[in-house]
Regions:
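ATP-dependent carboxylate-amine ligase catalytic core
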Residues: 1-67, 75-99, 111-114
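Short hydrophobic alpha-helical runs that function as membrane-insertion/retention elements
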Residues: 71-74, 128-130
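Conserved beta-strand segments of the P-loop GTPase G domain that flank and frequently precede/overlap
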Residues: 73-76, 104-106
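Internal gly/pro-rich beta-alpha loop/helix module
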Residues: 82-167
Length: 167
């Protein structure tokens, strides 16, 4: 969400939308942002392959294809363990050239991370760490999306709260 990004990063952020913009416009918008940055991060929407209807039109996958961007997939691991390998394999092989290069495991137990890391590596992915489950750590949502950054109580503390990295 651009409001969260702007607040956390203390900079203006933008939007790339393949539903409303053609490929050239998307590449031009990204190139303008890249000129003034050392790194550019594109946050995906919904499920990685989810677009209009039962297609990839307007999906994060489509943006990755248009921009030739490597993808770091965030996988919700709450309630799963060994199935994480199947989830990763499914995402990386569902479409040819998925662009998925790395993974961050969300809501993962520290004890399970070594096995998840190995599963990712066996698929040629770079495991970039995990975020442990924290009671009260999830951001609230409502119909049509998350609450705004200004509505989150203790925003800075919650965003800064412990996460494990493996860089």
């Amino acid at each position: 969400d651009a409001m969260f990004h702007s607040r956390v990063l203390k900079m203006r952020t933008g939007n790339l939308d393949s539903w409303f913009c053609d490929k050239t416009t998307i590449r031009t918008l990204l190139a303008k942002k890249e000129k003034s940055s050392d790194i550019t991060v594109i946050e995906g929407v919904m499920g990685y392959y989810d677009g209009a209807g039962f297609s990839t039109k307007g999906s994060s996958f489509e943006i990755a294809q248009i921009t030739d961007t490597p993808v770091i997939l965030i996988v919700n691991c709450r309630g799963i363990s060994n199935s994480v390998g199947a989830v990763l394999k499914g995402f990386t092989t569902f479409q040819e050239n998925s662009q998925i290069r790395g993974v961050i495991f969300n809501q993962m137990s520290e004890k399970l991370y070594p096995q998840a890391k190995k599963a990712a590596q066996e698929l040629g992915l770079i495991p970039l760490g995990f975020l442990p489950y924290k009671k009260g750590g999830a951001l609230e949502s409502r119909h049509l999306g998350l609450v705004t950054a200004d509505e989150v109580v203790h925003f800075k503390e919650r965003i800064s709260a412990g996460c494990a990295r493996d860089l």
